[in-house]
A protein has these predicted regions:
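Transmembrane-helix signature of 12-pass secondary carriers
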Residues: 2-226, 230-237, 257-311
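Short intracellular "coupling" helices and adjacent cytoplasmic loop segments at the cytosolic face
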Residues: 239-256
Length: 311
C-alpha cells in the first residue's frame, strides 16, 4: 500500500472529505504538486520575464524610458482585470477545462508576440497574453487543493507555491543564459534576436502544462459540488488507483453522504458582476487588504528596478 495511506473507514457511504482521504497519499499527489508548481513557474516567467526583456528590446521596439515603465505593468493589469472572471468560469465550467484553455491560448499568443514588429503590436499581444495567464495564476491553488486530501492539503499547496519563489531565481538565470547570445536572423518584417527567443522559452512551461493537464482528472470536488456524483467518484477511484496500485474497482466508497456545496450553484445564479462586487467590499476586510498590498509590493517591487536601466 502506498506511503501515506492512512487507516480510514471502509464504509461505502461517506462525506466527500472522507472519500477524498480514502484515495490515500502517494504518486498522484506528487504528480499534482509538480504539475501545479511548473504551471505557476510559467506564470512567473510570463510576468516577471518582461523585467529582463525590456532593457534589451528597447532598441528594436524604439522604447522611451516612459514606454518601459508603462509596458512593465501590462501583464499585472491584465491579471487584475480578469482574475475574477477566470474564477467564475472555473466554478461554472470546470477547473481542468478552463486551465487547459487559458494555457493553450496564453502560450500561443506569447509565442506570436515574439514576432512583433513594433512596440504597439508587442504591447497588445502581451496584454492579451496577460488576460489568459491570469487563469492559471488564479486557479492553480484551487485545483491543487482539490486534488489532495485535507490532511495533506496545506503542505501540498505550500510546496506548489515554492515554485513562485524559485521562479524569481529561474527567470534571471534563464535570461542570463539566453540574452548574451549574439545572433540576428533577418526575417522579412523583423530581426529575430535573442530576446525574441527568450519570449518563446518563457512560454514553454504553459505549452508543456497544457499537454499534461489533458492526462489529469477534473477536480472531484468540483464535480461533487455540481451534483455529478458518478463522475466525481470515478475520478476519486482513479486517484486511489494511482496512489495505491490497486484496481479502481477496489476503491471503498460507492456513494457520498447527501451534502452539496451550495455556493457554486448560488454563484451561477448571482452572476459574475455581483460576485465581483462582493469580493471588492474592501471595508469588510480592510486590515487583510492592506497587509496583502504590502506583501505583493514586497514580492514584485524588488524585481522591477531594472526596468528603466539600459542594456
Amino acid at each position: 500500500m502506498a506511503s501515506g495511506f492512512d487507516k480510514l473507514s471502509t464504509a461505502s457511504k461517506q462525506s466527500f472529505e472522507d472519500a477524498m482521504s480514502n484515495t490515500g497519499f502517494g504518486k498522484f499527489n506528487k504528480i499534482s504538486v509538480a504539475f501545479v508548481g511548473f504551471m505557476l513557474l510559467g506564470m512567473i516567467s510570463e510576468t516577471l520575464g518582461l523585467s529582463y526583456i525590456i532593457p534589451v528590446c528597447h532598441c528594436d521596439l524604439k522604447m522611451t524610458p516612459t514606454d518601459k515603465i508603462w509596458f512593465s505593468s501590462i501583464p499585472f493589469v491584465a491579471i487584475i482585470i480578469t482574475s475574477h472572471m477566470w474564477g467564475y468560469l472555473a466554478d461554472t465550467k470546470g477547473r481542468k477545462k478552463i486551465l487547459c484553455f487559458s494555457m493553450v491560448v496564453g502560450s500561443i499568443v506569447s509565442i506570436i508576440s515574439s514576432f512583433s514588429p513594433n512596440l504597439y503590436t508587442f504591447a497588445v499581444l502581451r496584454f492579451t497574453c496577460g488576460l489568459f495567464i491570469s487563469g492559471p495564476s488564479a486557479l492553480g491553488y484551487a485545483y491543487l487543493g482539490e486534488l489532495n486530501p485535507i490532511s495533506h492539503r496545506d503542505k501540498m499547496i505550500t510546496l506548489g507555491n515554492a515554485s513562485v519563489i524559485l521562479g524569481t531565481a529561474f527567470v534571471p538565470l534563464l535570461s542570463w543564459a539566453v540574452l548574451p547570445f549574439d545572433f540576428n536572423v533577418n526575417l522579412w518584417f523583423i530581426n529575430y534576436r535573442p530576446w525574441r527567443l527568450l519570449v518563446c522559452i518563457f512560454a514553454l512551461p504553459y505549452v508543456i502544462c497544457a499537454f499534461v493537464i489533458t492526462k489529469l482528472p477534473e477536480s472531484p470536488k468540483f464535480l461533487y459540488a455540481q451534483g455529478r456524483i458518478q463522475e466525481s467518484l470515478k475520478n476519486l477511484s482513479y486517484i486511489y488507483s494511482v496512489n495505491t496500485g490497486n484496481n479502481p474497482s477496489e476503491y471503498p466508497v460507492s456513494t457520498y453522504l447527501q451534502f452539496f456545496f451550495k455556493h457554486i450553484s448560488d454563484g451561477r445564479k448571482q452572476g459574475i458582476l455581483l460576485r465581483k462586487w462582493n469580493l471588492f467590499k474592501v471595508y469588510l476586510h480592510k486590515k487583510k487588504y492592506i497587509l496583502m498590498i504590502f506583501l505583493i509590493q514586497g514580492v514584485t517591487g524588488r524585481t522591477r528596478g531594472i526596468l528603466t536601466s539600459d542594456s
